[in-house]
């Protein structure tokens, strides 16, 4: 555990100068956190924590990953946002993530709505929802991808490296629709 107060950490990460300098905003700053095991001294300051997370983020986005993000025409934060959707869409069968990522990229490229249940659940802030209903789709939120086209403003969770890489290595196919099996065992 860190001694520094969580409000202090929050303040450092949403500092307008830091956000602007590093191409983040308050919606997508969560993408600076790359899942890994990090060691910190208990008395690490908020400033040093932010500096370390930015260093890890920049290290993670190596030339190969940067080139792949460019190839699919997404910023790093957009990759993280899409990866968070893929993560929540398929959190059991990781081998299906590149296919799901490809499907969402196809929708983006065709200027379609993503119509992602996980983003709607995030918008509703009701994480007990197992099945999205038509009444749920009426919520007015930029995270309602049934209502608005394109990616939501930021990630809906901190995506795993596996999900980020699934987006960067998305399957090349023409799929734009999927249907989950009734028992949620796959698509």
What is each PLM-predicted segment?
Residues 1:
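Extracytoplasmic/periplasmic/luminal assembly and interaction segments
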Residues 4-187:
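Bacterial extracytoplasmic/cell-wall-associated proteins, especially those involved in peptidoglycan
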């Amino acid at each position: 555990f860190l001694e520094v107060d969580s409000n202090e950490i929050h303040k450092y990460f949403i500092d307008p100068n830091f956000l602007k300098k590093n191409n983040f905003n308050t919606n997508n700053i969560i993408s600076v956190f790359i899942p890994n095991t990090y060691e910190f001294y208990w008395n690490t300051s908020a400033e040093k924590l932010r500096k370390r997370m930015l260093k890890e983020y920049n290290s993670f986005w190596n030339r190969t990953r940067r080139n792949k993000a460019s190839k699919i025409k997404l910023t790093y934060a957009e990759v993280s946002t899409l990866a968070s959707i893929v993560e929540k869409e398929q959190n059991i069968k990781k081998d299906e993530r590149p296919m799901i990522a490809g499907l969402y990229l196809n929708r983006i490229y065709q200027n379609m709505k993503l119509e992602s249940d996980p983003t709607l659940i995030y918008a509703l802030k009701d994480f007990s929802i197992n099945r999205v209903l038509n009444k749920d789709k009426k919520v007015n939120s930029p995270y309602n991808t049934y209502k608005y086209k394109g990616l939501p403003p930021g990630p809906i969770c901190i995506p795993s490296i596996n999900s980020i890489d699934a987006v960067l290595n998305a399957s090349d196919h023409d799929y734009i629709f999927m249907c989950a099996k009734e028992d949620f065992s796959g698509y």
